[in-house]
Curated annotation (Swiss-Prot):
<dbReference type="GO" id="GO:0005615">
    <property type="term" value="C:extracellular space"/>
</dbReference>
<dbReference type="GO" id="GO:0009986">
    <property type="term" value="C:cell surface"/>
</dbReference>
<dbReference type="GO" id="GO:0062023">
    <property type="term" value="C:collagen-containing extracellular matrix"/>
</dbReference>
<feature type="site" description="Cleavage; by thrombin; to release fibrinopeptide B">
    <location>
        <begin position="32"/>
        <end position="33"/>
    </location>
</feature>
<dbReference type="GO" id="GO:0043152">
    <property type="term" value="P:induction of bacterial agglutination"/>
</dbReference>
<keyword id="KW-1015">Disulfide bond</keyword>
<dbReference type="GO" id="GO:0005577">
    <property type="term" value="C:fibrinogen complex"/>
</dbReference>
<dbReference type="GO" id="GO:0045921">
    <property type="term" value="P:positive regulation of exocytosis"/>
</dbReference>
<dbReference type="GO" id="GO:0009897">
    <property type="term" value="C:external side of plasma membrane"/>
</dbReference>
<dbReference type="GO" id="GO:0051592">
    <property type="term" value="P:response to calcium ion"/>
</dbReference>
<dbReference type="GO" id="GO:0034116">
    <property type="term" value="P:positive regulation of heterotypic cell-cell adhesion"/>
</dbReference>
<dbReference type="GO" id="GO:0031639">
    <property type="term" value="P:plasminogen activation"/>
</dbReference>
<feature type="domain" description="Fibrinogen C-terminal">
    <location>
        <begin position="220"/>
        <end position="476"/>
    </location>
</feature>
<feature type="disulfide bond">
    <location>
        <begin position="219"/>
        <end position="304"/>
    </location>
</feature>
<feature type="compositionally biased region" description="Basic and acidic residues">
    <location>
        <begin position="35"/>
        <end position="45"/>
    </location>
</feature>
<comment type="function">
    <text>Cleaved by the protease thrombin to yield monomers which, together with fibrinogen alpha (FGA) and fibrinogen gamma (FGG), polymerize to form an insoluble fibrin matrix. Fibrin has a major function in hemostasis as one of the primary components of blood clots. In addition, functions during the early stages of wound repair to stabilize the lesion and guide cell migration during re-epithelialization. Was originally thought to be essential for platelet aggregation, based on in vitro studies using anticoagulated blood.</text>
</comment>
<dbReference type="GO" id="GO:0042730">
    <property type="term" value="P:fibrinolysis"/>
</dbReference>
């Protein structure tokens, strides 16, 4: 029983790992994706608080020095030695003897006191004289310093006076001479700047007016022209380059690139993608009138022999396809250089009143019948939603696709990067976003969808072509 439980647990773990692995893979057959939530984001690091300055006790104040006062020791003079006479009478009878001593002793003490007082007065006068002398010496020193300061101040005043006089002279010369000259120079510079600003404004105005029309290039255009490129090749125009065509004599001629080499030539290029230099995520009016660069010239040639990235314009495409039976050739190339094509024997685009509805038939080729049959990776209803035949043209500001929803944000053109005959949404997306390198993923797209230059029936949803072009030509019997 224990072995049975271990076996069941192992099988469950293996199934869980397999399910996790399968969910991490990108299913290339899914035409649309969703923007996942990125759960790998890290929390922003928080700043560490700075440690506070070190605080607390420090050194104590130094103790004040104690003056070693010298105590005065009273020195009492020793008493005079006694005068002792062997005979007391002798002392009386002899005044210069012991009695004189007694008299002197009687007067000695007051005299000593007077002398001490005089000494004290002399010391006091001496100290006062010393202090007075020191004070006079200090006053003398201070007077000398003041005299020196006065002299220094006089020197500084004289120096400042000289500097001020020089500065006044410089200011006078500057005001009287240089400033008028500088003002004249500044006026001249101002006039020059005003002239340049006016020229820039004029150039900007001219450039703005120029940019209202589709981009053009300066190339020598062949003299030969016609209703379309097929008529031009029949008139002798055999070089693939930019020509003027005029499908209707009541309208002005316009420039197109004619492919005179592919499958006997005579093809009018209505769309071309090759380097991502032109943004195809545009509104209804640019797609109606056309946009991009028709052709460019090679370095060694004076004519425009290289096609640019452009959309010819829905009005022009509709006019060309309604002249008569028209065939469509779609060529594409991957980033390895491999090429395939889709050829439709019938191709018609209705007028703007009918929302430029598209019709195709008679497919043959190697790319897969994406326009008529939808994405080959899908089945049933999902595949039906990717069929383009019969659809109206849609742009992100004119929603005519087959995606019926109450959410105005859900529309194919907005999510898939360009204007096209979207259903819900596409098997082919020639006007999508240009991705360098081919392979891309939902997290690289703007809305999490397969919005590249896609032809699902050849490379699936998550591979954007390096080159893709659409060319039309009147149907005629081939010899």
């Amino acid at each position: 029983m224990r072995h049975l439980w271990l076996l069941l647990l192992s099988v469950s773990l293996v199934q869980t790992q397999a399910a996790t692995t399968d969910s991490d893979k990108v299913d290339l057959s899914i035409a649309r994706g969703h923007r996942p939530v990125d759960r790998r984001k890290e929390e922003p690091p928080s700043l560490r608080p700075a440690p506070p300055p070190i605080s607390g006790g420090g050194y104590r104040a130094r103790p004040a020095k104690v003056d070693a006062g010298q105590k005065k020791v009273e020195r009492k003079p020793p008493d005079a030695g006694g005068c002792v006479h062997g005979d007391g009478d002798m002392g009386v009878l002899c005044p210069t003897g012991c009695e004189l001593r007694q008299t002197l002793l009687n007067h000695e003490r007051p005299i000593k006191n007077s002398i001490a007082e005089l000494n004290s007065n002399i010391n006091s006068v001496s100290e006062t004289s010393s202090v007075t002398f020191q004070y006079l010496t200090l006053l003398k020193d201070m007077w000398k310093k003041k005299q020196a300061q006065v002299k220094d101040n006089e020197n500084v005043i004289n120096e400042y006076s000289s500097i001020l006089e020089d500065q006044k002279l410089y200011i006078d010369e500057t005001v009287n001479d240089n400033i008028p000259l500088n003002l004249r120079v500044l006026r001249s510079i101002l006039e020059d700047l005003r002239s340049k600003i006016q020229k820039l404004e004029s150039d900007i105005s001219a450039q703005t007016e120029y940019c209202h029309t589709p981009c053009t290039v300066n190339c020598n255009i062949p003299v030969v022209s016609g209703k379309e490129c097929e008529e031009i090749i029949r008139k002798g125009g055999e070089t693939s380059e930019m020509y003027l065509i005029q499908p209707d004599t009541s309208s002005k001629p316009y420039r197109v690139y004619c492919d005179m080499k592919t499958e006997n030539g005579g093809w009018t290029v209505i769309q071309n993608r090759q380097d991502g230099s032109v943004d195809f995520g545009r509104k209804w009016d640019p797609y109606k009138k056309g946009f991009g660069n028709i052709a460019t010239n090679e370095d060694t040639k004076k004519y425009c022999g290289l096609p640019g990235e452009y959309w010819l314009g829905n009005d022009k495409i509709s006019q060309l396809t309604r002249i008569g039976p028209t065939e469509l050739l779609i060529e594409m190339e991957d980033w390895k250089g491999d090429k395939v094509k889709a050829h439709y024997g019938g191709f018609t685009v209705q007028t703007e009143a009918n929302k430029y509805q598209v019709s195709v038939n008679k497919y043959k080729g190697t790319a897969g019948n994406a326009l008529m049959e939808g994405a080959s990776q899908l089945v049933g209803e999902n595949r039906t939603m990717t069929i383009h035949n019969g659809m109206f043209f849609s742009t992100y500001d004119r929603d005519n696709d087959g995606w019926v929803t109450t959410d105005p944000r859900k529309q194919c053109s907005k999510e898939d990067g360009g204007g096209w005959w979207y259903n819900r949404c596409h098997a082919a997306n020639p006007n999508g976003r240009y991705y360098w390198g081919g392979l891309y993923s939902w997290d690289m797209s703007k809305h999490g969808t397969d919005d590249g230059v896609v032809w699902m029936n050849w490379k699936g949803s998550w591979y954007s072509m390096r080159r893709m072009s659409m060319k039309i030509r009147p149907v005629f019997p081939q010899q």
